[in-house]
């Protein structure tokens, strides 16, 4: 991934902190199952590693999340509301939990 993103001389700290941030998002809500697309499995595996190491040091504190993949292979990547690419905050084609019902319906 470092080569793919062309991080030659320096690697942004956000790149290294992202797995910790995602693990915090999952563990803060004590998620037992995490529905993800196949492309997100490495991130969830890292989360599971973080949980295991944390629990080894501090006792059984965090919940170890189970990866739940879609049963339909056609849904391995959730399409964005633009219908072009996978749903992503950075592409601006996602639905937020804070979106109003009318806005969500507008995207259907």
Q: Which residues does each predicted region cover?
A:
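Active-site cores that bind ATP or allylic diphosphates and position pyrophosphate for catalysis
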Residues: 2-108
């Amino acid at each position: 991934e470092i080569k793919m993103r062309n991080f030659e001389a320096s690697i942004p700290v956000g790149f290294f902190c992202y797995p910790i941030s995602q693990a915090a998002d999952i563990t803060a809500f004590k998620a037992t199952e995490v529905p993800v697309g196949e492309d997100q499995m490495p991130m969830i595996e890292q989360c599971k590693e973080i949980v295991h190491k944390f629990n080894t040091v501090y006792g059984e504190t965090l919940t170890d999340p189970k990866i739940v993949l879609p049963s339909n292979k056609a849904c391995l990547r959730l399409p964005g509301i633009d219908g072009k690419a996978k749903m992503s905050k950075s592409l601006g084609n996602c639905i937020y939990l804070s979106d109003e019902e009318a806005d969500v319906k507008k995207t259907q």
